[in-house]
């Protein structure tokens, strides 16, 4: 990358997917979406696992979007995407500008060279905060941050780990009776 942009501010804290997409769409508009641009998003976040932000950004920018992109080919302003499905894939074509939510198989990361690592320290990183974005109609104190989030998490926890399974070996009647007795004892059957 030649430059970076950090979107950050206290006003953005506590945002759910709706509010996050408002903020990111405003930031993308601030940077500028050109006719031949492609906005790349991940498939989903690991914290909420909702897979909503990318699609919501595309809606707010009024650009086409394709989800679950596994392979992308660009020819001028035509974008051809192999989209993964549960039981196969489909190939879709769209025009730029567009937004793609990508699965990890789309890219094989490469290791940075030492020179590349050193170069990254000289690349500019600008910050877009609330004051930089507040003139955008998407940035309204009632639609961003905790106040603007229609969903709230009241409790988050890691469920207790279940114990190791019990292994039964054998293919005789006694093994089957032992299995049936265990299942009855646990009220499974």
Question: Which functions belong to the PLM regions below?
Answer:
Residues 1-189:
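N-terminal glycine-rich FAD/FM-binding segment characteristic of electron-transfer flavoproteins
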């Amino acid at each position: 990358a030649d430059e970076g942009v950090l979107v950050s501010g206290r006003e953005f804290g506590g945002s759910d997917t709706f509010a996050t997409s408002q903020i990111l769409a405003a930031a993308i508009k601030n940077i500028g979406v050109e006719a031949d641009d492609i906005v790349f998003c991940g498939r989903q976040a690991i914290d909420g696992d909702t897979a909503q932000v990318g699609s919501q950004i595309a809606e707010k920018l009024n650009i086409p979007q394709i989800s679950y992109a596994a392979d992308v080919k660009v020819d001028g302003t035509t974008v051809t995407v192999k989209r993964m499905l549960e039981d196969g894939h489909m190939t879709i074509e769209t025009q730029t500008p567009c937004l793609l939510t990508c699965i990890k198989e789309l890219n094989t990361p490469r290791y940075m060279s030492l020179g590349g690592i050193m170069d990254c320290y000289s690349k500019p990183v600008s910050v877009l905060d609330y004051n930089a974005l507040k003139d955008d109609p998407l940035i309204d104190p009632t639609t961003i941050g905790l106040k603007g989030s229609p969903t709230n998490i009241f409790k988050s926890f890691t469920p207790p780990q279940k114990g190791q399974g019990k292994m039964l070996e054998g293919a005789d009647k006694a093994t089957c009776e032992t299995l049936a007795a265990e299942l009855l004892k646990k009220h499974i059957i």
